[in-house]
Amino acid sequence: KNTLVLLPTSDSLLINEINRIHSSTNHIYVSDVSSVYQFTRDGEFVKKLNKQGEGPNEYLNISDFFVDKGDNIWILSRTAKKLYQYSADNELLKSISLDVWAQNISPLGNDILLYTGNETNSANMQLHLLDIATGTIKKSYKAIKEKQAEYLHVKGNNVFRKISDKECCFSQLFNDTIYNVASDSISVAHTFDWDGHNI
């Protein structure tokens, strides 16, 4: 059942362009480039995380985020090439420097899945599985197609869809294939035939 939830606005609660929405059992989370806003499922404002800056406990921007099982907020700053984990009390718990220019993230078991699009990297892959404990990439998937990388620069904000704690769907703009990604594999879930017009 779909439910329409109206979120409040005021002079002290003005959300910029929304780039991501996540929901949990009890809360709705909305982010723009600088803050993550938390609301109840009924739309009542709870709090916001705003740590934008250049200090040791701050992030430069929010490119993507998710909320883990412990209600910790993970923030990706593509500009800084870093991941930040903040507690439910907005305290920085961890930061991880990345070797790739990630633009989207998704939790996958005890790891984090990174999507880099067609940005070339040492592995020349689009998906990278980051080990949270060590802060290192332990596996990469889906080779970058060099010809597509020359012209296909359109970025979509919604490349991941969670299936379970250990599996998610992955799809790209202008791509005819939807993949299932697990911590140890990637497989084709669906392929669409556009009658000869596939890119």
Predicted regions and their residues:
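Short coil/turn segments at the loop-to-beta-strand junctions that recur within blades
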Residues: D11-L13, L49-E58, S97-N104, A143-Q148, ...
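Short loop/turn segments that connect beta-strands within beta-propeller blades
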Residues: T40-E44, Y86-E91, D131-G135, V181-S185
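Conserved beta-propeller blade signature
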Residues: H27-V30, N72-W74, I112-L114, E167-C169
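A short helix->beta-strand "capping" segment at the edge of beta-propeller domains
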Residues: K1-N16
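Residue-level detector of Asp-centered blade-edge/turn motifs that repeat once per structural unit
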Residues: S23-T25, V67-G70, P107-G109, I163-S164
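Asp-box/WD-like beta-propeller blade repeats and closely related beta-sheet repeat scaffolds
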Residues: L60-S63, L76-Q126, T136-L152
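Signature of short aromatic-glycine-proline-rich micro-motifs recurring in repeat-based ectodomains
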Residues: L13-R20, L60-D64, V154-F160
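Loop-centered beta-sheet repeat module
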Residues: H128-I186
